[in-house]
Each structure stands twice: as C-alpha cells, then as structure tokens.
C-alpha cells in the first residue's frame, strides 16, 4: 500500500519505530538516516524530539546539518563602532584637535587671532552698561 506521494507508510504508528524507551531516554535518533528520508511527513513528528539541534528535518523528510552559528563578539556598551574611526568624510585628525591643513591652526572657536574683533566693530563697554 502506498500513500498519495508514492511513499510507503511506516508499519504501525510512528512512535513504534523507536519504541517508548526513546521518549524516556532521549539522545540520538536510532532510526538510520535512509529510513528517515523515506518516511512521509506525517511520520516525522516523532523524530523531532530526539534529533540534535544541529540537524534540521524538513517536512519532506530530508535531514540536513545546520552549521554552527558563529557568535560575533559585541563591542562594550560604551564603544560605538563609529567612534573608532569616525565617518569616512570627516578629516582624520578631527577639526577639534587641530583640524586639516586648511583649518586655522589656532582654531577660530578657541579665541581666534589676537586682533579679533576689529576695534571699530566692538561696542564700547560704556554703551553696553558695563563698568
């Protein structure tokens, strides 16, 4: 007798292939691999509890090995990946630390040249109400 898929149904209920001791003991699946591949999908549910996690049983009865997943070591929570090198368009030295060659070496933000601001532009201290 054959099923609609053309596969032979296993003799007896699926659990009888392994016997009830496997449900208690667990461990590796004692049914040989070729037998597992010939089983119809309805008979595979009993193998899922005992197949190692590194093995994947597809609904068609194909047993494939799953390669171990390599865990990527995460950086410590304080370090973000961008902090190490910064964006690629940013000058490597960083504007705050001296900046690129076209940037004024003293840095405009840090006080600027001694002649700044020009004497004509600055408000007299008396006009601002300062002593």
Swiss-Prot record:
Ranges where the record places region Disordered: 101-131
Organism: Homo sapiens
Domain of life: Eukaryota
Protein name (database record): Putative uncharacterized protein FLJ45684
The organism's taxonomic lineage, starting at the top: Eukaryota, Metazoa, Chordata, Craniata, Vertebrata
């Amino acid at each position: 007798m054959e099923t609609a898929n053309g596969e032979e149904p296993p003799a007896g209920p699926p659990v009888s292939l392994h016997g009830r001791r496997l449900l208690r003991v667990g461990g590796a699946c004692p049914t040989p691999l070729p037998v597992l591949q010939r089983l119809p999908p309805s008979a595979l549910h009993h193998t899922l509890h005992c197949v190692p996690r590194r093995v994947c049983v597809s609904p068609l009865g194909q047993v494939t090995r799953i390669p171990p997943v390599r865990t990527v070591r995460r950086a410590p929570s304080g370090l973000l990946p961008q902090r190490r090198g910064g964006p690629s368009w940013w000058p490597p030295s960083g504007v705050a630390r001296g900046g690129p060659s076209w940037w004024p070496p003293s840095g405009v933000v840090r006080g600027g040249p001694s002649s700044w601001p020009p004497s004509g532009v600055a408000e007299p201290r008396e006009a601002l109400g300062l002593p």
